[in-house]
């Protein structure tokens, strides 16, 4: 579980996050959604300790995330970003195992974990000998997911992991990701700007606006009982193009 208590983060005079209190529950997927600049990625970086709050506290399973505890707590978290963040000079296998090598795992332990993970993420084992520029976008994200899961973390954080993929690859990986989340039963925090992804993955959805929480709850509550005109407009803005196309088809 991750808990943020009245967390604020500023860059200069601008607030990226302001007075946010939020809990990402264990064995559930919390989706952070909102327009660009609403604070989604900043919140994720605060949760993993890559940036420090100017005010408020972040705790992971009851332990406060500070400069002195960040490294140890970060080993209990896996992190996936939009483009994968793989090292271009390393093979897929070496990328997946980079943290295990850093911690001095023996080769047989690494081999066994790689074998487990390649089955879990449904990646062709032959792809592990290739470099990132030889892999498709979906394959790179599967390797990135292997790396995030290598140490069997308690928490998995994903920052728009599907955003750069073409629609067919995205659909396949989306199905596989949800299956993985359900099977592993970890605390998952998933960032997206897409309400379809939020509905697909989220046990709980947190809609952000200018660094603050506008509404939170199951996706159905945002759709059926929007808390403000902003919530209505945000949802309608993503529905409108599809409705426009349906109207044209009927005509």
State what each model feature region is.
Residues 216-217, 225:
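ABC ATPase "signature
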Residues 101, 108-126, 179:
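Conserved ABC ATPase "signature" region
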Residues 152:
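Conserved catalytic motifs of ABC-family nucleotide-binding domains
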